[in-house]
Amino acid sequence: MALWMQCLPLVLVLFFSTPNTEALVNQHLCGSHLVEALYLVCGDRGFFYYPKVKRDMEQALVSGPQDNELDGMQLQPQEYQKMKRGIVEQCCHSTCSLFQLESYCN
């Protein structure tokens, strides 16, 4: 009986220190919920919404091509697929985990 009483605090610590299963479940996160989740996961590191390739391409398209800038930016099929996987597509249109959210941290 004494051994049980000595092990009880350890069992309680292990029980309460295991991650909540709800936090590990993939979730749909859209709008302000997505931004709040990113702030929570990334903290002071900050975050971005799109992969760097897409941001570079959007900037070139907004400013317009100069001296054939877009010639060097032709996308391969793999790169095009990466562009389609922004955080909204990954976490709002589909579901994402905390680990996937963390991939958008700076």
UniProtKB/Swiss-Prot annotation:
Gene Ontology BP, a term: glucose metabolic process
UniProt subcellular location: Secreted
Disulfide bonds listed in the record: C30-C92, C42-C105, C91-C96
Major location (coarse): secreted
Positions annotated as propeptide: 56-83
Gene3D superfamilies (alphabetical): Insulin-like
Protein name per Swiss-Prot or TrEMBL: Insulin-1
Organism this protein belongs to: Xenopus laevis
Higher taxonomy: Eukaryota, Metazoa, Chordata, Craniata, Vertebrata
